[in-house]
Curated annotation (Swiss-Prot):
Protein name per its UniProtKB record: G-protein coupled receptor 87
Family, similarity comment: Belongs to the G-protein coupled receptor 1 family.
Upper lineage: Eukaryota, Metazoa, Chordata, Craniata, Vertebrata
Gene: Gpr87
Coiled coil: none
Glycosylation sites: N4, N24, N33
Source organism of this protein record: Mus musculus (Mouse)
Length: 358
């Protein structure tokens, strides 16, 4: 599911495809370009991934702690908990990339990344994408179709649907692990596709197409839900002013989801999808491949940044989460401060009247 800049194709599941090492070998002797490329691979990328690794551990660790104290009252909260799990698993793959890119691992360390780590990274990235789509559908149903089929709103249905998502992603991912069974050597270790069996290579490409279609489907759902909610709120705000403020908050919530989705996932797929469904890579020269490699790595980094941006969704969209966070931090929300001030004033009034009645 990553770009492989040995590029015969834009394959899917190689997060740690050996584009950097292939590009290094082809760029040797090119002076400044080679030095810049080496610094990008061995210094800049490891530092960037180290930063988001530390940030993600802190943010998602806090999220796990808070969600542990929140009951599964709604399907929305349950979807958020699934995203936390996916983000944490995805985060745990970062150290492997950092070690590889910084040059600290042995040569056969590449095999671990090809067979396990890259598969886990992409499986959990697309799991997060699916749950973001489910959250947008949940917001649409709660705002536009609040009196629809009751089974769609039950927590049992949500749990079953969530299990189905994890099972499907496991079914797509496990063959990529099992069929990456080639004998690693110093000659083939830098190309993950050479470590796959013939069936593994075909499965890998099939999963690449499935994931690309999955992204497009979720993108369409997100945009469709956002437009539908916006239109409904605009239409109903003229009739029911008291209810529209609450529904406007739902609209702001889905805006956060759309913003995170577009920021993290759209750039990478704009870079990847044209190559997945065409033979554009055959038309590119070496300099174009190098530019594509930099674009791929930076847009892939943006996708990885999703693990740090998802906590923003928890904070702005989940009242239970923000309330629990403020409570644990001894910080009052604005509404709580107003209620507390009103309570104090009422107490002062009662004391005044009690005193004057004496």
């Amino acid at each position: 599911m990553g770009l492989n800049l040995t590029l015969t194709k834009l394959p899917g599941n190689e997060l740690y495809s050996q584009a950097s090492h292939t590009a290094n070998s082809t760029s040797e002797g090119h002076g400044k370009n080679s030095t810049l490329h080496n610094k990008f691979d061995t210094i800049i990328l490891p530092v960037l991934y180290l930063v988001i690794f530390v940030a993600s551990i802190l943010l998602n660790g806090l999220a796990v702690w808070i969600f542990f104290h929140i009951r599964n009252k709604t399907s929305f909260i349950f979807y958020l908990k699934n995203i936390v799990v996916a983000d944490l698993i995805m985060t745990l793959t970062f150290p492997f990339r950092i070690v590889r890119d910084a040059g600290f691992g042995p040569w056969y360390f590449e095999f671990i990344l090809c067979r396990y780590t890259s598969v886990l990274f992409y499986a959990n990235m697309y799991t997060s994408i699916v749950f973001l789509g489910l959250i947008s559908v949940d917001r649409y149903l709660k705002v536009v179709k609040p009196f629809g089929d009751s089974r769609m709103y039950s927590i049992t249905f949500t749990k079953v649907l969530s299990v189905c998502v994890w099972v499907i992603m496991a079914i797509l991912s496990l063959p990529n692990i099992i069929l990456t069974n080639g004998q690693p050597t110093k000659e083939n270790i830098h190309d993950c596709m050479k470590l796959k069996s013939p069936l593994g290579a075909k499965w890998h490409m099939a999963v690449t197409y499935v994931d690309s279609c999955l992204f497009v489907a979720v993108l369409v759902i997100l945009i469709g839900c956002y437009i539908a909610i916006s239109r409904y709120i605009h239409k109903s705000s003229r009739q029911f002013i008291s209810q529209s403020s609450r529904k406007r908050k739902h609209n702001q919530s889905i805006r956060v989801v759309v913003a995170v989705f577009f920021t993290c996932f759209l750039p990478y797929h704009l870079c990847r999808i044209p190559f997945t469904f065409s033979n554009l890579d055959r038309l590119l020269d070496e300099s174009a491949h190098k530019i594509l490699y930099y674009c791929k790595e930076m847009t892939l980094f943006l996708s990885a940044c999703n693990v740090c941006l998802d906590p923003i969704i928890y904070f702005f969209m989940c009242k239970s989460f923000s309330r629990r966070l403020f409570k644990k931090s001894n910080i009052r929300t604005r509404s709580e401060s107003i209620r507390s001030l009103q309570s104090v004033r009422r107490s002062e009034v009662r004391i005044y009247y009690d005193y004057t009645d004496v």
